[in-house]
Amino acid sequence: MDAQKAVCKKYKADFLASNHDLKLGIALNVKEGIVPINGLRINPEGDTTGWYIWAGEEFSEAPDFFVPLHVEHIDEWNPEIKRYLGLAPGWRFLIANNYEDVWFDPNLLESEVGK
């Protein structure tokens, strides 16, 4: 949690925890070591965090591109992702090797990614 709060402080973002028992949407290609890793957060609903994470430049509109994953298992996929999961809805990140970009995208607050 401290690393997540530090990212939020660095970018002046609100913090919203992604509890370990909640789910995020993640693309299977994240496990393949493809870069960059992209993440975006929409408003959470039900038992989800609102996070969608994928590797590569673009994500697919295919209905099975994102699979559900409990937050507690994210380290098994890519441990670098966890530090960004405290960013509030409307925030995005892109990481690749030693590169990091984090920004606010107000369009995400009206979005229905992965639906």
Name each region found by the language model.
Residues M1-K9:
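Extended, charge-biased low-complexity segments
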